[in-house]
A protein has these predicted regions:
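Core alpha/beta nucleotide-donor-binding catalytic domains of modification enzymes
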Residues: 1-210, 234
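Short, surface-exposed loop/turn segments at secondary-structure junctions
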Residues: 186-190, 212-215, 291-296
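Short amphipathic alpha-helical segments with heptad-repeat character
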Residues: 204, 208, 212-215, 219-226
Length: 382
């Protein structure tokens, strides 16, 4: 394959995934998160090349983690590339030392969110490749995961989009060489820390020796898992909830559980999907349109709520804290998922009340009655 063939193939892959999965719309401003490394520099070059055809405006965001003495040089390099290509750019500095992988990732995404807002971008494109997807699946499999975890890195989550997920690292390197770009190299990527580096340098090469197409195979696994989870999710939550909107923009969700199967396996599977969906719905309302940080619900959270639900007695109100300042409130056979703040300062809500008692999210009970007025003006309660 010639250099021109490589360039055409990579650009076609990005264009197809962008159009096929609705990663952007004509007229959007897309911020490419560029570290200066091969993957992100490749993505920036591709997006710039496709901008006219896709009717996009490309801008650049760079996050300086301040972990290496050369990090300022990386920021300067990205700024020079953006200026040379006539692209608006912004740089953010974050402090991630001592926060661990999860903390560093959260700080990076929060910084990207701020840069996107500053630049007025509708989407943030990150340069995760097919190899990154494979490494993620291997890492989750080793640590333990379910079908949801096998979905891997999503092509889109909120404003985050990953147009390079169908492109392998070797293709990226060939693209960079073909267009004559010189990328920055992060020396920490060559070591065996963190865990992902050991997967990249030790485990994945062994798997490639057994199956040279292992990266593509794991990519298909992620796509299949995503499709199956989405299908089951749709069936599980359809008509199974009631939402309440608060004046503060928050949302509470009350789950209907009367239709759950009696068998524990199917019951837990459907309940898990409903609870996760409700949690994500409440979190999305709290996070606003960006929703960069998912505060994912783990199996331990689902089991905790299920245990409380199984032992519920009478009108006793019991609560289980969930990630992201969300609470599951259990009353009898009802589970309501509400923002934590609603339990201390309930917002003013409109709620339809019928004669008798009505349960509302948060464990609140409304008592209602109807009154029939006779000709003599005397009321009769029902």
């Amino acid at each position: 394959m010639t250099g021109a063939d490589v360039v055409a193939a990579v650009q076609r892959a990005v264009r197809d995934v962008g159009a096929g999965q609705g990663l952007w719309s004509p007229g959007d401003r897309v911020m490419v998160a560029c570290s200066g490394g091969p993957d992100s520099l490749c993505l920036l070059h591709v997006m710039r090349a496709l901008a006219s055809d896709q009717a996009l405006e490309i801008v650049v965001g760079h996050v300086d983690h301040q972990l290496r003495p050369s990090s300022r040089d990386d920021a300067q390099f990205v700024a020079q590339v953006a200026q040379r290509w006539g692209l608006k750019h912004r740089v953010a500095q974050v402090t991630v030392r001592g926060t661990g992988e999860a903390g560093a990732r959260e700080a990076r995404y929060e910084a990207l969110k701020g840069l996107a807002e500053d630049l007025g971008a509708q989407a943030i494109a990150t340069a995760h490749t097919a190899d990154d997807q494979a490494e993620t699946l291997i890492m989750r499999w080793i640590r333990g995961t379910g079908v949801r975890g096998l979905r891997g890195i999503p092509t889109r989550r909120g404003v985050l989009v990953r147009p390079l997920l169908q492109v392998g690292r070797r293709q990226v390197e060939a693209y960079i060489e073909a267009v004559g770009l010189q990328a920055r190299e992060d020396p920490t990527n060559a070591g065996l820390e963190p865990f992902r580096n050991r997967i990249r340098h030790q485990i994945l090469p062994l798997l490639k020796a057994e199956n040279p197409l292992i990266v593509e195979a794991l990519g298909r696994l992620a796509e299949n898992a995503h499709a199956e989870v989405e299908a089951l999710h749709h069936l599980a939550v359809q008509g199974a909830s009631r939402e309440v909107l608060g004046p503060d923009g928050g949302v509470a969700v009350r789950l209907e559980l009367g239709d759950l199967p009696k068998e524990r396996g199917p019951r837990m599977g459907i309940f898990s999907h409903r609870l996760r969906w409700a949690h994500e719905r409440v979190r999305r309302a709290l996070d606003g349109k960006h929703g960069l940080q998912g505060h994912q619900l783990g199996r331990n959270h689902v089991l905790a709520v299920e245990e409380v639900l199984a032992s519920a007695r009478g009108r006793e109100v019991r609560r289980v804290s969930l990630p992201g300042k969300v609470v599951a409130v259990v009353v009898e056979a009802w589970v309501s998922v509400v923002p934590e703040t609603w339990l201390t300062t309930p917002p003013a809500l409109e709620w339809e009340v019928f004669p008798g008692e009505t349960l509302a999210p948060g464990g609140f009970t409304f008592k209602g009655w109807s009154e029939e007025v006779t000709g003599e003006g005397q009321g009769k309660k029902n």
